[in-house]
């Protein structure tokens, strides 16, 4: 190959294109983000759960919901976030984030999550009054990093919801274990199943279901939903009712119902599914 700008440029673009992967817009797309070394980041924060960390994660999830084109559902729990992208009933054609280009999808979502978390963390620091706690928060500023992966779900919406069920179940199990480690030694809870830890907590008057906030038990799930709002008609100069869309969180009873499902096809019978603007 002759070293001219055009020759090298064309060759590099050819190789880049050969290695580029596109996600299939006709199948549900799952994007999963994790905080890199999340366990190290939370070291020194309040145990077993830190409200500042939960708040920053929630704000990060909401920003991803707003910025990732095609997202219909965003879930966060602990230090991870799951985004589902699929066809909705409004648009005839579904155009996913960056047209489904895999490398751009994972690099941009990781960058958005990293930037938004650190932005939220700084806001929390600025309003924190406890000087000792504030110094702990400051020591972690700009150290949050997220990685991202994206893939197509084989199957249909049930399989996509199953991936969500799996992550939510994992978060709730870990939550019980974390509360257990607050009141018992590692030796006392070692090798115990989740329900056994919950029973031990009940025996000493610390019921997981009552003592832990919803966001620390299950995380939170944001769904893009239509609602009737107000708009202005410039022709008639009147206020009119218009359909708008926004992101809404999920009450605890809906997440409990979702986690209680034991058969794949029954996921479509849940309130969470009813809220989705899903199109086959």
What are the roles of these predicted feature ranges?
Residues 1-280:
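Regulatory and interdomain segments flanking nucleotide-handling catalytic cores
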